[in-house]
A protein has these predicted regions:
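Alpha-solenoid helical repeat scaffolds
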Residues: 59-60, 92-96, 128-135, 147, ...
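Hydrophobic face of amphipathic alpha-helices that form TPR/SEL1-like repeat modules
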Residues: 26-33, 45-49, 60-67, 96-103, ...
Length: 203
């Protein structure tokens, strides 16, 4: 494939902290502090909430550890908080758990584990997770090689992404994988994509 998995992982992990919706205070207080670049205060607020089991705070705290903002950078701690949030169904955290396994950051590299967590985020409707899952199926990395499933996920990702770079990546991936597929296989992939519905998993 022409789209490197790791570059997509990195791009999403950087962007998602400032685009994830947050609830009313005190979680919002941490978000306001983060946007004001008072990372220490954000870390203090989210740490307190994360320890009570709040999955959004756990996810956000994981990002602070991953980036070394307000706390010392600690990839293992980042993974710990991502995993706790992911286990509660937080899709963004599930994506970052997958990214951690894919790159071997904070946890030993694991292709099967990466695929498992990309799938969980993809099933909740995260387009970049869907793209990555399609790439894994296209290459047979961590999952069975399956062009029909690959194209299915590319089709789903394409309709969920805004115009621009990532959508162009999906279009290229669709072209690449479909070049070696029969008409029946392409139609089956499109049927699966049409029938697919997101399945929210938790908080």
């Amino acid at each position: 494939m022409n789209v490197p998995l790791r570059s997509l992982v990195a791009a999403w992990s950087i962007a998602v902290i400032v685009t994830t919706p947050v609830a009313a205070s005190p979680l919002e207080d941490g978000y306001v502090a983060y946007r004001a670049m008072d990372f220490g205060k954000a870390a203090e607020i989210w740490q307190s909430l994360a320890e009570t089991g709040d999955p959004t705070a756990q996810y956000l705290l994981g990002n602070l550890y991953a980036d070394g903002k307000g706390v010392a950078r600690d990839d293992a701690a980042a993974f710990k908080w991502f995993r706790l949030a992911a286990d509660q169904g937080n899709a963004a955290a599930q994506y970052n758990v997958a990214a951690s396994y894919a790159a071997g950051v904070g946890v030993p590299k694991g292709e099967v584990e990466a695929a498992t967590w990309f799938r969980r985020a993809a099933e909740q409707g995260m387009p970049v997770a869907q793209l990555n899952l399609g790439l894994l199926h296209a290459s047979g990395t961590g999952v069975a090689k399956d062009s029909v499933e690959a194209l299915k996920w590319f089709e789903i990702a394409f309709r969920g992404l805004p115009a621009g770079g990532p959508r162009m990546d999906v279009a290229r991936a669709m072209t690449d994988v479909s070049a070696n597929m029969s008409g029946d296989e392409i139609n089956e992939a499109r049927r699966r994509a049409r029938d697919w519905k997101a399945q929210p998993q938790g908080k």
